Amino acid sequence: MSVLDEIIDGVRADLAERQARVSLDELKERAARAPQAKDGVAALRGEGVTVICEVKRSSPSKGALAAIADPAALAADYEAGGASVISVLTEERRFGGSLADLEAVRAKVDIPILRKDFIVTSYQLWEARAYGADLALLIVAALDQEALVSLIERAESIGLTPLVEAHDEEEAERAVDAGAKIIGVNARNLKDLKVDRSTFERVAPEIPDHIVKVAESGVRGPHDLIAYANAGADAVLVGESLVTGRDPRAAVADLVAAGAHPALRHGRG
């Protein structure tokens, strides 16, 4: 069994517990009261290369990363540094996240928020909207094509922008065929958790220009952002290096400045 399979087994068990406590109708009522969802595509189509900053306590590959007692304060630092989108991990077992983190961040920041989790049912999409998310992660490797198409359509119908994650050319093609408007290429292999930064360079050419291309994993600083930008990235997602660093606001500002450099924009055409 792969790491991804193990994570999803845990996600399904935790999901069953939440479904027993909170009905879908209750979630829909809460979602109806939530602020109107912000446009994730527009947020990531900014000048130069935009930055998604992640609230992330731990990971399967590294274990505990940071305590993050106040996720909202961290998100506010990200926003102050110039982040375009905040990513909030809500998976509990491997990443130490929660829907409470998502709710707290929503109350603090004005920019769009991505619910980052292992979404396998429409119930989780309703959770995302109910707790204030504007975007939701859908992982191609976790879904068959019928489910992927269905979840993209459901997400968009309730105001969410799907960020569809691929790990190779075949998955990117599936994401394009399913109608994704944002595709994230994750350099981390979910089978063995190793990072290969050349993954984006291989996969990006398979993604049409009208789709926002996000480089995920392996961004340690501006030099990695620039490398991804030169390979065609419209945005990067950064987590570990921010939560383990001393000054997340300054680190984000450095990334944003690199992404906005005129020479970089010119180089990307």
From Swiss-Prot:
Pathway in which the depicted protein is active: Amino-acid biosynthesis; L-tryptophan biosynthesis; L-tryptophan from chorismate: step 4/5
tRNA processing among keywords: no
GO biological process: L-tryptophan biosynthetic process
Keyword terms, alphabetized: Amino-acid biosynthesis, Aromatic amino acid biosynthesis, Decarboxylase, Lyase, Tryptophan biosynthesis
Keyword Lyase: yes
PANTHER family: INDOLE-3-GLYCEROL-PHOSPHATE SYNTHASE, TRYPTOPHAN BIOSYNTHESIS PROTEIN
Protein name in the entry: Indole-3-glycerol phosphate synthase
Organism per entry: Streptomyces griseus subsp. griseus (strain JCM 4626 / CBS 651.72 / NBRC 13350 / KCC S-0626 / ISP 5235)
Gene designation: trpC
